[in-house]
Amino acid sequence: MPSLIRAVIFDMDGVLIDSEPVYLGMQARNLQTKYPWVTLESMYPTVGMSSQEYPRFMARLCRVPFTPEFEKELMQADENEPIHFPEILRPEARPMLEQLRAMGLQLALASSSPMSNIRQVLGECGLMEFFPVIVSGEQFEASKPDPEIYLHTMARLGRRPEECLIVEDSTYGVQAGAAAGGLVAALRDERFPFDQSRAQLHIESLSEVPALAACGGKKIRAAFFDVDGTLISGGSHKMPAILPAALDALRKNGVALLLSTGRHPLEIEEENLLPGLHFDGAAYMNGQLCEWKGHPVAQNLISPEELASLHAYLDRTGHSCIFLERDQMYANKVDDRLIAGQAQVGTAIPPLRSLDGLEQREIYQLIPYVTAEEEPELLAAMPGCKTLRWGNAVVDLTTKAGGKEKGIRALCEAMGISIDETIAFGDGANDREMLEMAGIGVAMGNALEEVKQSADYITDTVEEDGLAKALHHFCLI
């Protein structure tokens, strides 16, 4: 279960307003006449400093004693060029704050700037209404990177550190938030040599903050979808009308789209199960074949020894079975069980093929038509395999090394992301371990009860647009 974020604490300068280039440029210009060695780059360390520490640093930089006269000189330099703060307010700031407030999150501002400056900025930008808690660094003896300002703000909010998402940018600010025990999201700014290594999360825009809060501090970079009962309704294969637009919006928000299905890619293509949908990768056949950007990244084949045992088992029992190779599917026979099973998933009956030479074939998955009573004998003949039942007389059979969760791990490795950065959607028994493993597991409203118990969140059914509703719930679209 993702951690619950209850409050978001913002730094001001460099976060809500793009003030750092303005402040530093103005100060450098006003000081260079008297102190020509002062450059914009030499002033970078002042970003995030408190109003107490800043003049002392500048005295050292200007190679003069720190005196009231020098402090007055700095103040006069700052006053020489008035700043119109609404012009440097980040355009995404207000919509982001409105969304966070609508989500019921507590908001606070903790800035190293003097309180008078904070109130001026918030007042001129029309943001005062969003921050019932405002804390200034001038209230404390120690400034950032000391965590006191954030610990005090958390206490004012009545929240534990793990319930707080802190949005920072500067080296000192990130260090202060991390030392306070909060979850720190660092806003990247390539213009400044900030050390943001202590931050657990990194964002390119404030517009990412609502999703981080809704997802419990997880930055979702990949979404895995079961097909039947998740993207489309089971049996009828009906797709919700809003689904294509929802998935397109998800991709535009930087999330990779991947399938995680028990189906063979041929079924999806030939039956036109997902018209108009495009995916970046897939774990097919319950993770037996994994592809990323059209290239295989992992595969598990059933061994020749297991296939020989299966051959003997089928000859002995007369059961029907479907065989899934890389580029084809076929059955050994058609009987009432197979007809009923294919009708259950709304898929055509595959062509027939002899079992001669079965041991030499590259088989990824099997679909034996066996009852629960017959299943133990099959597994005894194939000890390196496991089954997942999806009907009264039918199972999926894969290697023990397979499984949707194994496929997701292989795909995450190929993408260079962690499991924690994933969200997965499913409804069936073969989805349970996948939902337990993903950063966020979402069960459809039509899911099996044991699958719902394994999920972090339960959405509505396929027919009720459950998938799109879940994406909205987690602010991913």
Regions found by a protein language model. Name each.
Residues 2-44, 219-223, 227-275:
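Active-site neighborhood of HAD-like aspartate-dependent phosphohydrolases
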Residues 4, 82-109, 115-119, 236-255, ...:
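Short, acidic loop-to-helix structural element flanking the phosphoryl-transfer center
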Residues 27, 93-123, 177, 247-270, ...:
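Substrate-recognition element of Asp-dependent hydrolases with the DxDx(T/V) motif
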Residues 37, 57-95, 103-105, 220-238, ...:
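Metal-dependent phosphoesterase signature
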Residues 69, 241-337:
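Active-site phosphate-binding/coordination module
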Residues 86-87, 108, 114-165, 171-175, ...:
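Substrate-recognition "cap/lid" segment bordering the active-site pocket of phosphatases
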Residues 159, 309, 313-434, 446:
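Conserved acidic, metal-coordinating active-site core of Asp-based
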Residues 197-222, 240, 380, 397-477:
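Mg2+-dependent phosphoryl-transfer enzymes with acidic/Ser/Thr/Gly-rich catalytic loops
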